[in-house]
A protein has these predicted regions:
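Helix-turn-helix DNA-binding elements, focusing on the entry/boundary residues of the two helices
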Residues: 24, 35, 50-53
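A short, Lys/Arg-rich alpha-helix, primarily the initiator
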Residues: 1-22
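Short alpha-helical "recognition helix" segments of helix-turn-helix
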Residues: 27-28, 56
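Residues within the alpha-helical elements of helix-turn-helix
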Residues: 19, 30, 59
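Recognition helix of helix-turn-helix/homeodomain-like DNA-binding domains
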Residues: 33-48
């Protein structure tokens, strides 16, 4: 089984949503995506496209850099 640590996360979507008291369900509705898609992004199983990251940043009123983990290799 592969062990995943916090530094392997490519995005900070889970953190930013929590900071804003927003849910994955709410974001899914805003983006017209399924809750499953958002869940996979939040858990860093899949990643949103660059265009989707910019859409998310706009919806959450944050700089797109806020959504990215600067510790990625």
């Amino acid at each position: 089984m592969q062990q995943i640590d916090e530094h392997s996360n490519k995005n900070r979507l889970k953190v930013v949503l929590a900071e804003q008291n927003k849910s994955g369900k709410w974001l899914a509705l805003q983006l017209g995506k399924t809750e499953n898609t958002i869940s996979r992004w939040v858990r860093n199983i899949n990643q949103p496209t660059v265009e989707q990251l910019f859409d998310i940043a706009k919806i959450l009123n944050v700089d797109v850099k806020t959504l990215l983990n600067s510790n990625c290799d």
